Amino acid sequence: MFADLQGLGLTPQEINKVAYHRQNLGNPFINQEGKPMTIYATGIEIPEGKNKGKFVSVPGYVGGRIVTDEDQLYNIWKKDIQSGKWPVYETADQLNARDAWLHQIMDKDMAQYFEQQRLKQPYQQMESLFYQDPFLTIK
């Protein structure tokens, strides 16, 4: 269903983020603008351990809700961070650049997924101020 990730230069940890996103496509968080969110990637500075002072990108969409507190996110994902599940970068700029690339991949996934869902739905007339389907108005 989705594009193959090979050849895109992703690390195994970045692929884990795309997999997390793909798992949540069927149940995204809908933000205030009505847009679906599947991961809410959040960069946090690692406060302890071998990667202390480096930056990790973790999902902020957890358990059907958005978590923005960095300390809370670190506690939620601590074991996964320490085990190397999520990508770690030397600087926040490196993290932001890679997340921007991953976001492009995820945006393509989302567009493809929702287009497929739209095609599965029965025909529904879209409302328009300028057009009305004449076949639906005949009585």
Q: What label would you give each PLM region?
A:
Residues 1-139:
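Charge-dense, intrinsically disordered terminal/linker segments
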